[in-house]
Design a protein with these regions (language model features):
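N-terminal small-residue-enriched
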Residues: 1-445
């Protein structure tokens, strides 16, 4: 690979490409899914590809390959030149010059990579068995999944930059259905971790069973205004679907109402929103972004005040600011976009139970669905199917389902009254505690 990249760079220079970058990614992944104690899906893949981009006659061109021979060199160079000639975007930023120290981060866990496929299958089967045997009302277990992967990224460019990292990750997820007379309840739970021990059978299986059983005998509440608390994981889903409004790329396309509001108050004083790619154990952690820019922590919203958009080199150049190092490619062949890393709401000091006792009565939303159809990131409006439970004097009362909770995310940020201390990152890079958002409209019976 070293010789191939060197040959590619030399060929690009000889062809008149002014500057260029090779982005190499490799992925060694495993996935197994079980249903009712049987393995129904099994995948083990090793893939490697190279994305190549270069500035030719003032325009950026793109090409990619999964072949690494002499013929591929010529195809990549020609592909970049042809792509650049068709490009109408004149706002491309120059490639990163490679300056600045790269944080020393160890994202490897060789022990995870050495776990055998059978050991992984045994783990997901053990989790499923635990759920099934936890209560006679558990009727079915399905879509129980274990994933593991080892991923390597290497970026080399014509400015002399050559940096790489490798990470090991895994995830364990379970789902179940319970029956009690005419009542049926389904729920799921999962964890992501950088170690095999982090894929805890008792934790995942116990939570799947508890959440599924907690939903039995659920019913809608009467329609009206309710004091609403989003449970941490439901709040993560909500923040995740609206995270793009904090992207400079989105704002520059006129698709974020935060455009032009840096320095203004956009949220309640208790709201602080951070993007931290240096977080130990974070699923979004990385030493540099997908343009090679060293990672750094940024406070996006501080005590309710909007401090910065998230940027890559292109958006930063357009706004006349420094990049925040949040460039991301969804694959080696994709264009560069802006994406948060470990993006989270800073937690408060009180536990969820203490916060609920302080509120008195209301509705806790534990799950939301229909996020893509029911949420509009441009306007901020949302209307989502939800599950949860009512509470009084801080104590859980009745399970709730088949309701719709509606509001506006921009208004919700300003309406936040308190954040609990239970910060969690459910399965990825979005983290939230449980949040008291004041009153929202709920449609039920």
């Amino acid at each position: 690979m070293q010789d191939f990249v060197k040959q590619l760079m030399e060929a690009a220079k000889a062809a008149g490409i002014e500057e260029c970058e090779a982005y190499v990614s490799s992925r060694d992944s495993f996935r197994a899914m079980t249903t009712e104690g049987e393995v129904v899906e099994y995948e083990s893949n090793l893939t490697r590809g190279l994305g190549f981009r270069g500035l030719y006659r003032g325009r950026m061109g793109y090409a990619s390959t999964e072949a690494f021979d002499e013929e591929a060199v010529g195809q990549l160079v020609r592909g970049v030149m042809e792509s650049a000639e068709l490009c109408e975007d004149e706002d491309e930023a120059p490639l990163y010059d490679g300056g600045g120290p790269v944080p020393d981060m160890d994202l490897r866990n060789p022990a995870l990579a050495q776990v055998t496929p059978q050991e992984k299958i045994d783990r997901v089967l053990a989790m499923e068995k635990l759920v099934k045997e936890s209560d006679p009302r558990i009727d079915k277990t399905a879509h129980n999944v274990i994933n593991t992967g080892s991923y390597t990224v290497r970026i080399v460019n014509s400015h002399g930059m050559d940096r790489s990292y490798t990470e090991d990750v895994g995830a364990l997820y379970g789902q179940a259905t319970a029956k009690d007379g005419d009542f049926v309840s389904s729920s799921g739970y999962g964890v992501a971790a950088r170690s095999f021990d982090g894929l805890d059978v008792k934790k995942v299986g116990g939570e799947v069973a508890r959440r599924t059983l907690d939903g039995l005998n659920a019913a809608p509440v009467p329609s009206g205004k309710y004091r609403v608390v989003f449970f941490s994981e439901a709040m993560c889903d909500l923040l995740g679907v609206f995270s793009s409004i904090f992207s400079a790329e989105t704002a520059q396309k006129g698709m974020s109402l935060l455009k032009g509001r840096v320095g203004e108050r956009i949220a309640a004083p208790c709201v602080t929103l951070v993007d931290d790619p240096l977080m130990e154990g974070g699923m979004g952690s990385r030493p540099f972004d997908d343009e090679g820019v060293p990672s750094a922590t940024h406070t996006v919203v501080e005590d309710g005040v909007f401090r910065t958009f998230l940027h890559n080199l292109k958006t930063a150049r357009k706004d006349g600011v420094a990049t925040t190092g949040k460039a991301r490619k969804v694959g080696y062949a994709s264009a560069v976009h802006v994406t948060p890393t470990n993006f989270y709401l800073k937690p408060g000091k009180r536990t969820l139970d203490d916060m609920l006792r302080g509120i008195g009565e209301g509705l806790v939303i534990t799950e939301v669905s229909g996020l893509h159809a029911g949420a509009n990131p441009i306007s901020g409006d949302f209307s989502l199917l939800a599950k949860g439970y009512t509470f009084r004097e801080g104590r859980r009362e009745k399970p709730v389902e088949q309701i719709t909770v509606a509001g506006n995310f921009y208004e919700l940020l300003s309406a936040v009254r308190e954040l609990a201390s239970d910060l969690t990152f459910p399965m990825g890079g979005i983290g939230c505690p449980s949040v008291d958002v004041g009153e929202l409209s709920v449609s039920g019976t």
